[in-house]
Amino acid sequence: MKQPVRVAVTGAAGQIGYSLLFRIASGEMLGKDQPVILQLLEIPVEKAQQALKGVMMELDDCAFPLLAGMIGTDDPKVAFKDADYALLVGSRPRGPGMERADLLKVNGEIFIGQGQALNEVASRDVKVLVVGNPANTNAYIAMKSAPDLPAKNFTAMLRLDHNRALTQIAQKAGVAVADIEKLTVWGNHSPTMYADYRFATANGENLKDKINDAEWNKDVFLPTVGKRGAAIIEARGLSSAASAANAAIDHMRDWALGTNGKWVTMGIPSDGSYGIPEGVIYGVPVTCENGEYKRVEGLEIDEFSRERMDKTLQELEEERAAIADMLK
């Protein structure tokens, strides 16, 4: 058996946390031979701490062979101590009458604090995934608040958009999800994201040529993927928690264990390529190997794609401007 690794999860008693923790503890994220110690953070409110205790009782009751230990806390410095992986799931949801700018600021404070705590106590190789929305900007804030950690350690979750797009394309083209390669999602995890299947293939056949429907792409596919979260809230009365947890598992598993040359989408700090300013956390196609991600380079960007990529970049720039004074 390998040495246990430490996995920190924030918002651990929330809806996504509840869908996530049992799968991490069963080995779905890091492999069936990798023991884990779960370090679980919840807000310092009695109700949340009680709920966390209940979740930990259930985790105990599963008797997972790979669960080597657990702590529950309201202190980020305890939760992130020596963490090898950190899934930042907890964030403040948008309340009634709350402007997006207010939401950015409230979450800004949370992610400044968490970035500072990671900077102080986490493993220097910690892999950070921000799930809590607005994910890209929250990841940017955490990254900027952790100057002693490599910027590349901070990522945002675009995998839910990626997985949503996969299924829409599979259904449209009449192919199996598992057969689709080279799909990507550019930009922000928001309705402005740009899901791009120009390079996608299934069994060697180009899917753009197979689907061959620009109207469907613009008027059906992109809006369906972009507004899927809202559609689920409307149908279920609750946000998409299980599918978000599933995407987080996919993202971290691929980063840790590799993608065998397959493209996946991750929100990562830009290196200036594809016309995205350096440092902006932006969804791009990557492959993963030996615990590192590598962006897919040199893809051609056509006029429609440039327009969509710039639109989602503009939103990210606006978000960044809204919290700029907090990072001084």
Curated annotation (Swiss-Prot):
Coiled coil: none annotated. Keywords: NAD, Oxidoreductase, Tricarboxylic acid cycle. NAD(+) binds at G11, A12, A13, G14, Q15, I16, G17, N107, Q114, V131, G132, N133. InterPro entries: L-lactate/malate_DH, Lactate/malate_DH_C, Lactate/malate_DH_N, Lactate_DH/Glyco_Ohase_4_C, Malate_DH_type2, NAD(P)-bd_dom_sf. Its EC number is 1.1.1.37. The active site is at H189 (proton acceptor). Catalyzes the reversible oxidation of malate to oxaloacetate. This is Malate dehydrogenase.
